[in-house]
Amino acid sequence: MQLHSRGSSLAMPPPPIPPRDYQGQQTAVQKDQKVSNSLFVPVSCDPPAVPCGSVHPVPLPKFYKQDKPVQTNNFYGNLLVGEQTLPVWTHPYSVWYSKDPDYVGLGISHTASSQKVFGDDPNANPVKYFFSPVGICSLLLTSQQLQHGHELLVGECERFSCGVRFDCSGKSMSVKLVQGMGFVTAVYDGLSPMIKSKVGIQNFQQKQGSELKKYVATLFDQTNWVIYSSGDLQLADAYTVVGTTPGLVQIAKLCGDEQPYDAAAGAYVDDMTLSGSADSVERYCFDYKLNGRSASGKTIQWALPHQYAVFDQSTASEAVNMTLDSTCKGPMKAYLTKQFVMNEELPPAEVQFEPWSQLHGFTGYSQDRLDCIRQIANEEVDSFDVVNASNTDSMYTAGKILDKGAFMLYVVAFVLKDAQLARKQLDKMKRAFHRFISNQQQAPLVYETNWKGVVSTGGLNDGNFYVDFGNCFYNDHHFHYGYHIHAAALVALADQSYGDGSFLKFSRAWVDTLIRDVANPSKEDSYFPVFRCFDFFNGHSFANGLFAHGDGKDEESSSEDYHCYYGIKLWGLITGNGQLEKLASLILGIEKRAINMYMLYRSDNTVVPPNFKANKVSGILFENKIDHATYFGLNKEYIHGIHMLPITPMSSYFRDPQFVEEEWNEQLSSVVGSLDDGWKGILMLNRALFDPKSSYEFFAAPNFQYKWLDNGMSRLWATAFSAGIGG
């Protein structure tokens, strides 16, 4: 049955042309928001706008102190689920809970770039994947008492840190894991320190230079490790160092000058907090809270390439002459500091709703382009039944379909300025959204009170993690909810000009709830963990939720990652929430730099191995591995296309013309002609980012076939977008 808009709305006179200053036209503001210049203020502290439930198939681990919502997609996730024995990457180190006989404790490893393993064919260029070996137990923090029984507890789980405690009859060994930490630090309470090595200790020597006892262990693999201790240590055998006094033990790998470690020894990071001001959005800080005392009053922290590329002079001046390789993200540099201060470049202010590219910005439309777009609109708006098409059991699929309809709405409302078509499409979009906002979809959402988040009920009761791509296990929430958030922003924009303006009020709490689930900026919002998906240290989001994985967290779509924060940016504009809009802009700025180092590879990329970068895109980026693949197949169009979709005004900010042209010429031009499904449309719209004319001609052609469209893609948006950037 074809759905039509209500007849009464068609008789209304056309509205005035909406101004381009979208932010200026918004009047809805948060009346209850506390006055603060911080970027990191709550979106809301209200109860979630979905029902509550107490069932979840993944049990919580044993905690020693955890009074906040628990992170689900974080770097220490392997310590929360399963056997809790898989590695955690703080970078540059990996650590893990070892249960091996005679080696019970916290294993420590660092792998150099020379140890990387390449495959399938290591001599190929490009290779399909590379990874760093795991489980090389260079050193292990333990105690003799732990070998005879203990309990592992995790606690104080924050966004950038997590505590691990080995309890033994009221005594303990505690380690705080912090991203980028310079030392692996253990505090022994009532237990005698013991350090073991599976590699073996060739030489163990006490040295001067620190207020603490200082030792250097040379292992049989010729790596050198420095150990600081508050008490005396002795080499018992080639695999064991023992101490007799409870207290502090710190371990780090030597990589040049020892003096910076000496200056930092005795102090360690207990937690890291974010700070940033809405008055200077591009500037953000990692503030490190230190425990203990060092000669310098500072500690060693390691930085990744996307960080030290934008360090403020105050941080850059604290660099020391030490470098260690990361697993997948190039060389890390060390800093003797208590704070990282970064000055990031932000997206251009004009990147909002209308088509935009780095080539020409927004070019506007000639009459013949408008005529073509109008013809397509008349066909597609009538034929696309968004109300029923979005009625699925998948938040991901439904989100893509809603966003397809929202892009179509934008075109008829703000490109064609066709009041009749706009109201017809707006009516359908509001009805489609009503199903989700009123939680009447096939698999309703629930706020589950164990891990504390909004999940699909699909798979929740039976633990089927294949349902909706693992949504109930916190997989891909920024992908799934990002589509809904973005679509809602476009509908709210159109409703202000062509409707009664009620959609914003009706949808506000629900959309805010989705935003809070994926990107809650503040601990003051006690319903959700802070920044579930986006990792400020790694510079991008992680999609993997409550699953143990031997290579750590991962992400296979850079584009659906930034699409989420693009949607949040637009929602901030629509709602008048300037701090939210600025926060999203900062995240987008960070992601642009990181993604173009670690996921999208121009020919001048110097971060990934030279024998991998000709792939042009990462495929799946893990914490310990990059695999040029997807979870749903190995076709070239899959691997590249999942890093493209959806193509939006934000796409060209990330995918610059040089990269897109290189990728097209080297990887895609030989493939696209043989495609006969939705991936063809994805690749051809991506072509608009360097060749908008060819892209426009493809979508505008009379013999265009709709089977060439992905289910989240419309011919109408593809034509309007490519035409609007010079096609």
Label the model's feature ranges.
Residues 3-478, 521-539, 544-545, 575, ...:
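Ser/Thr/Asn(+Pro)-rich, low-complexity disordered segments
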Residues 392-415, 471-499, 503, 507-511, ...:
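Aromatic-rich carbohydrate-recognition surfaces in CAZymes
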Residues 490-536, 567-570:
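Alpha-helical scaffolds that organize eukaryotic protein assemblies
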Residues 511-513, 558-591:
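Active-site neighborhood of glycoside hydrolase catalytic domains
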Residues 554:
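Substrate-binding surface in catalytic domains of secreted glycosidases
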